[in-house]
Amino acid sequence: MVLLESEQFLTELTRLFQKCRTSGSVYITLKKYDGRTKPIPKKGTVEGFEPADNKCLLRATDGKKKISTVVSSKEVNKFQMAYSNLLRANMDGLKKRDKKNKTKKTKAAAAAAAAAPAAAATAATTAATTAATAAQ
């Protein structure tokens, strides 16, 4: 994985979007980063380790090429503006998903059709009971 500066990351991310425009996907992850390069031991925290400031780790991949950058809290506003403009410019090829309302409607119609004979039988039983009590 290649760790890039913020501006280089945005440039490479634009290239990834252009490469995957016709077919393929770009996966982007964002998480808090405290500067550790080694995993946290199971027993607890490492003595003497104090993170200087909060940072964000951004990673992007198309399945073959991986890029990443670390953004400090001081430059996060500037980076987010550039990042949001890049996303707006390159996410024009999104397709609207077919919602699953069609399957819900068919299931609801099937349930109503199954319930209709039962409701008719209940109504007939009620009518017969009413007629029997009226005849007595």
UniProtKB/Swiss-Prot annotation:
Assembly and binders: Heterodimer with SRP9; binds RNA as heterodimer. Component of a signal recognition particle (SRP) complex that consists of a 7SL RNA molecule of 300 nucleotides and six protein subunits: SRP72, SRP68, SRP54, SRP19, SRP14 and SRP9.
Protein's name according to its UniProt entry: Signal recognition particle 14 kDa protein
Keywords from the UniProt entry: Cytoplasm, Phosphoprotein, Ribonucleoprotein, RNA-binding, Signal recognition particle
Subcellular location, record wording: Cytoplasm
One Pfam family per UniProt: SRP14
Disulfide bridges in this chain: none
Name of the coding gene: SRP14
Domain of life: Eukaryota
Similarity comment: Belongs to the SRP14 family.
